[in-house]
């Protein structure tokens, strides 16, 4: 057998550039000294690296000063955060494994594990894990906007989507809690005028960016940020007129839409409990004299002393909109429906069975897995959490039942509890 350490450096460099995940790059660099040095520049220029983008937040606090009526505003800085989902198996038993989620510090050989269905950090572990004992494969990457200091997910975003541009600046698209699409450009969040829909999710398909709204209508988003209706909507006779959360997912080689079903009556009662007259809109206000600052030291004394009335607003280049209508406690999930586009019938049809597949719905990603590849994973099911909750639940498409992790003695949640931690 030849000496692999003597392969030409140019060839090793080309191999390193074609590695598909950070884990593969770590494995490559650990082979020997020559392989490690050949990949020394890959981390900086590799397509897997996460762009470091700092944002002004979408949500700010506005206040009117007591002394002169001046409108003051306050915000905390935010940054784009990348996380990755992995399948981990024992090298000695690779048939089944676990699902884990880690932030980008993984490239520094540290597992900073996150809750799989949210982005909250799990308890720190000092246990060292040797990659020689495990097989780690990347499933999906995801993005969120988090606080620079707190690293907590910014609550004003429903979705954060990164469009990588070869040789150019990457594009960041978001869906705010108001259901509107915005993009980051010129040091500010930019709104798109004349949006007629409330949006729910993004997907990149064959190089094009699409969004789905709460009625199940797909829209194409051009490189100039024009939003153009694309295709048919989900018919009300199969959705029962639901305008809840819709998510894109690739499953069995096709693009599906997952519709989260909620208690519409409960949602209406919560909406009716709000006084519409209390909703304050500052859109197109004049902020020539506004004092915008970042509280880098956590000192709120000046702000609290000077202000007598304040409000949380979503701020972009078009103005401000009050957050209050979007801060209601969400109702519980009562089920899901799954749809795919029938190209012959030219309409969305309901999918009754996922076969061996299971769908994982996280706050920052939605993807499918082969159930037989994960410990305890139920086929034809959907794993999820309710909003503002951490507990994992599973919905079974065959009987419509929902099982909660804390209330179950079943092994169907074993995939989220690695034995090596």
UniProtKB/Swiss-Prot annotation:
Can you tell which superkingdom this protein's organism belongs to? Eukaryota
Entry keyword set: Stress response
Extract the Pfam families matched here: Beta-prop_KIB1-4 (PF03478), F-box (PF00646)
Matching entries from SUPFAM superfamilies are given as: F-box domain
- Induction section of the entry: By heat stress.
Q: Describe the location of the F-box domain by residue ranges.
A: 2-50
One GO biological process this protein is involved in is:
response to heat
Gene3D superfamilies for the chain: 1.20.1280.50
Task: State its role.
Answer: Involved in heat stress response. Contributes to recovery from heat stress.
Q: This chain belongs to which protein, by name?
A: F-box protein At2g17690
Species assigned in the record:
Arabidopsis thaliana (Mouse-ear cress)
